[in-house]
Amino acid sequence: MQPRLGGPALLLLPPLLLLLLLGAGGGDCGARAEVLFRCPPCTPESLAACKPPPGAAAGPAGDARVPCELVREPGCGCCSVCARLEGERCGVYTPRCGQGLRCYPNPGSELPLRALVHGEGTCEKHGDAEYSASPEQVADNGEEHSEGGLVENHVDGNVNLMGGGGGAGRKPLKSGMKELAVFREKVTEQHRQMGKGGKHHLGLEEPKKLRPPPARTPCQQELDQVLERISTMRLPDERGPLEHLYSLHIPNCDKHGLYNLKQCKMSLNGQRGECWCVNPNTGKLIQGAPTIRGDPECHLFYNEQQGARGVHTQRMQ
């Protein structure tokens, strides 16, 4: 399950870490904020265990011919995957966007963070989206463009909290302590707006009859709890790493609010996170399905489980 709100808030969260998760930028290594989220180096053993990414074909001389741009897998994994192209869907748990692209929530999204967690963002060129803002704007005006774009995705071990590649003339990023404080404030504001059931959109207009908000699914409720927990975390020392965030399990919900069959922990220390299979309605483990660092092929076990239930129902009748 792998880490972006736009601006400091979104980028602190993946693998919410998100938001660690979605982007790895070249960034200025001297910026203190980046030190908090630097991925560990990949060991030779970890790299040797990587399989060729889907779409890579072997050439006549045994050389790999890769018809796609390769990027590092989400989180702190060490293997390569094909990057998402311009216009393709993207989010916290999807492969990164290609070079020069960023994953943006849709401009009309009321909850950009949730949209990105659900993989409902779009890979767009930096500056094309309405949410885009320069790193300086985001850093100096935490209240402006708070739901901005995500950092550029390069095959790099550094996670740039403020977006984009590094370069001379960029202002130093603010401390991790300040960034987490801004993140906490933004998440709290999102929950407050959710609780209003849409009233904040009425502005000065005459009161309208509002529909009651739809009931939250178990997956959405679990995600809300995780976000609430992050929003109330104690601020770390500004130089202290935020490893405690990695221990959180961020549920992988689909666009309908159901659990995705495959749930995974975030990649860490050069190792892929473990993945397991759950029932899409309840989030409970599917018995017999393995927990592995790879694809447990959950659809096979889910179909088998559903088939067994169907046979049992027929016998009961």
From Swiss-Prot:
One of its GO terms (cellular component) is extracellular region. It is found in: Secreted. A motif (Cell attachment site) lies at residues 293-295. Gene3D superfamilies: 4.10.40.20, Thyroglobulin type-1. Its main location: secreted. The keyword Signal applies. Keywords: Disulfide bond, Glycoprotein, Growth factor binding, Growth regulation, Secreted, Signal. It comes from the Eukaryota. Residues 126-146, 190-218 are annotated as: Disordered. GO terms for molecular function: insulin-like growth factor I binding; insulin-like growth factor II binding. GO terms for biological process: positive regulation of activated T cell proliferation; regulation of insulin-like growth factor receptor signaling pathway; response to insulin. SMART domains: IB, TY. Cleaved by MMP9 leading to release of free IGF2 from IGFBP2-IGF2 complex, which contributes to enhance the motility and the growth of astrocytes. O-glycosylated. Residues 35-126 form the IGFBP N-terminal domain. Residues 216-298 form the Thyroglobulin type-1 domain. Disulfide bonds join 39-76, 42-78, 50-79, 68-82, 90-103, 97-123, 219-253, 264-275, 277-298. Residues 1-33 form the signal peptide. Multifunctional protein that plays a critical role in regulating the availability of IGFs such as IGF1 and IGF2 to their receptors and thereby regulates IGF-mediated cellular processes including proliferation, differentiation, and apoptosis in a cell-type specific manner. Functions coordinately with receptor protein tyrosine phosphatase beta/PTPRB and the IGF1 receptor to regulate IGF1-mediated signaling by stimulating the phosphorylation of PTEN leading to its inactivation and AKT1 activation. Interacts with IGF1. Interacts with IGF2. Interacts (via RGD motif) with integrin alpha5/ITGA5; this interaction induces cell migration, adhesion or apoptosis according to the context. Interacts with PTPRB; this interaction leads to PTPRB dimerization and inactivation. The C-terminus is required for IGF-binding and growth inhibition. This is Insulin-like growth factor-binding protein 2. It comes from Bos taurus. The lineage of its organism: Eukaryota, Metazoa, Chordata, Craniata, Vertebrata.
